[in-house]
């Protein structure tokens, strides 16, 4: 039997491996230098950073840093020692949710650990097995995975293609006439992986015609 490491070395030129050398240090494991924020250094050059969840530099604001330091001093850096669903749920989560709900003038609020989880849960909460999901073929992975979890039908249309989207909506409409369900049409305002702009104005127009 071939040694597992020999197999890895042998197949390192596969679909992903062949790009590893070119991607390393750029697309993969890019090394940013300087204070975390919207402006940092990459390979010796000043760059505008969009790959951190700190686009506007709010994490560097003096008040935010002060709150971080006070929380670490009071509860320690390791608190709350567990995911929220298990043993990590605290009164701080609940207080923050109440403050968010009050700020937004809503009945309640719920915090997710990350956006991916929020999107999956939203799609699941909106749909039942009689409904149809229609989504862009290059939608973000969280949208695609949310659609895949759907127990009913799901259909894709070609990326940012108005005609393909309309034809798919026509198919979905015929199906919903049989099931009595509705249609969830998914696109993006800005596609995060490419920067392409979604045709939101046309999407709204189509959705008014295909309910």
List each model region and its residues.
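Conserved PLP-anchoring active-site segment centered on the Schiff-base-forming lysine
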Residues: 122-141
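Short, small-residue-enriched loops and turns at beta-alpha junctions
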Residues: 57-58, 85-89, 141, 162-163, ...
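Active-site phosphate-binding strand-loop segment of PLP-dependent enzymes
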Residues: 155, 160-211
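Conserved N-terminal alpha-helix of the aminotransferase class I/II PLP-enzyme fold
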Residues: 66, 73-114
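N-terminal "arm"/small-domain region of PLP-dependent enzymes with the aminotransferase-like
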Residues: 12-78
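Active-site-proximal loop->helix
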Residues: 142-150
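Short, structured coil segments at secondary-structure junctions
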Residues: 129, 149-151, 210
């Amino acid at each position: 039997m071939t040694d597992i490491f020999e197999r890895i070395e042998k197949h390192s030129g596969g679909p992903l491996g062949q790009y590893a050398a070119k991607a390393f240090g750029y697309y993969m494991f890019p090394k940013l230098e300087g204070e975390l924020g919207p402006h940092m250094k990459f390979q010796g050059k000043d760059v505008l950073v969009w790959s951190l969840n700190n686009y506007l530099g709010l994490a560097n604001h003096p008040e935010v840093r002060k709150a971080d330091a006070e929380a670490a001093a009071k509860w320690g850096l390791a608190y709350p020692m567990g995911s929220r669903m298990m043993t990590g749920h605290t009164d701080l989560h609940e207080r923050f949710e109440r403050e968010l709900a009050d700020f937004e003038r809503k009945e309640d609020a719920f915090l997710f650990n990350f956006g991916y989880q929020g999107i999956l849960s939203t799609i699941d909460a909106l749909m039942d097995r009689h409904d149809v999901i229609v989504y862009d073929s290059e939608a973000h992975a969280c949208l695609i995975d949310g659609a895949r979890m759907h127990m009913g039908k799901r259909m894709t249309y070609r990326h940012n293609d108005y005609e393909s989207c309309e034809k798919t909506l026509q198919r979905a409409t015929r199906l919903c006439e049989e099931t009595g369900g509705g249609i969830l049409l998914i696109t993006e305002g800005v596609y995060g992986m490419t920067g392409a702009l979604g045709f939101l104005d046309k999407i709204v127009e189509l959705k008014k015609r295909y309910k």
